Amino acid sequence: MAREKFERNKPHVNIGTIGHVDHGKTTLTAAITKVLAKKGQAEAQDYAEIDGAPEERERGITINTAHVEYETEGRHYAHVDCPGHADYVKNMITGAAQMDGAILVVAATDGAMAQTKEHILLAKQVGVPALVVALNKCDMVDDEEMIELVEMEIRELLTSYDFPGDDIPVVQVSGLKAIEGEADWETKIDDLMTAVDASIPEPEREIDKPFLMAIEDVFSITGRGTVATGRIERGKVTVGEEVEIVGIRDTRLTTVTGVEMFRKLLDEGMAGDNVGLLLRGIQKEDIERGMVLVKKGSITPHTKFEGEVYVLKKEEGGRHTPFFAGYRPQFYIRTTDVTGQITAFTSDDGSNVEMVMPGDRIKMTGELIAPVAIEQGMRFAIREGGRTIGAGVVSKIIE
């Protein structure tokens, strides 16, 4: 089947749904597609399609990050539905890293829960610049005062994590009732999208910098070759261009023979696009998640760096005990965990400390077991046993 060309006539914005498990993120995502489909601005998708993670569906948990697309009057959106369950924070980090803004879904029946807080913290860590709150399941709460209390609580919570809690729009919605076609609740979905259009700033694309895409997934297409998927972080890539594969193993050169987005062919992919790149002469085994595709000669992999790190408090889901020099966690860099060692540290004011306590801010020297495309100013998470225990930024490359 010939694939249609992707029309690029509106600004493109990446957003997603975040929030506590069972607060209705996936239902709301389905409701947005359904309401916008009535105006011809989306293809309606039902809950099961978006929730398409068969291996975990039985337990009612969404694992995989689902991608949907839709348009409003002024924008084209790519929307990721991020899993809510704490076990899938790893996916949340890769998903949230792809967001220019997020819709924080909070059930009016419950208010803020543990993962609501965890996701707000993660949004802060991975640099999600703006949030809009969807107060969901409002059809189930008769008492207007109750809804107002939940709204106040959410605003205070956002402010405590350095988001502008007083200014962030809070829209009362019911994903379920909107899907069922109740006109008043459909209007609320329109209100939500109006708030998203107005409050999530159009991202400044990094289009003029050298091309870089972190690889999220790799698969083979019979008769065509190997495809690497991911979000283009910066720059642009055109069909026929030579790119380097950097990180984990020795750097290799390849040619991009195809660029696809939402199953449509493009002449080029640019910063902010979620694309699949077809690579010449590369086997599926040659590349893996965590490597990056970059403009030839623009980046070299490193193993040693200095970073500024905030170590999460116990209450934020961090460690309960201190750690010492020589500590070996995972460093979550772009799309993958890399084992490393914190070889030395001082407190953030430069004074010597013997150990690092949960809640501390430190300057640290880290050394990775495999070379990765790390850069100054880049953010990373420090993780242990599948949970985030620290958030940091690379302050200096050593080697």
Swiss-Prot record:
Region annotated G4, chain positions: 136-139
UniProt-annotated binding residues for GTP: 19-26, 81-85, 136-139
Domain of life: Bacteria
Coarse class of the protein's main subcellular location: cytoplasm
InterPro entries the record matches: EF-Tu_GTP-bd (IPR041709), EF-Tu_GTPase (IPR050055), EFTu-like_2 (IPR004161), EFTU_2 (IPR033720), G_TR_CS (IPR031157), P-loop_NTPase (IPR027417), Small_GTP-bd (IPR005225), T_Tr_GTP-bd_dom (IPR000795)
Transmembrane residue ranges: none
Cell location: Cytoplasm
Gene Ontology MF, one: translation elongation factor activity
Annotated segments matching region G1: 19-26
Stretches for region G3: 81-84
Keyword list, A-Z: Cytoplasm, Elongation factor, GTP-binding, Hydrolase, Magnesium, Metal-binding, Nucleotide-binding, Protein biosynthesis
Any one GO cellular component localisation term in the record: cytosol
Nucleotide-binding keyword on record: yes
EC number(s) from the headed UniProt entry: 3.6.5.3
Coiled-coil region: none
Functional note: GTP hydrolase that promotes the GTP-dependent binding of aminoacyl-tRNA to the A-site of ribosomes during protein biosynthesis.
Assembly information from the UniProt record: Monomer.
Alphabetized NCBIfam families for the sequence: EF-Tu, PRK00049.1, PRK12735.1, PRK12736.1, small_GTP
Family: Belongs to the TRAFAC class translation factor GTPase superfamily. Classic translation factor GTPase family. EF-Tu/EF-1A subfamily.
Protein name per the record: Elongation factor Tu
Species for this entry: Prochlorococcus marinus (strain NATL2A)
Gene: tuf
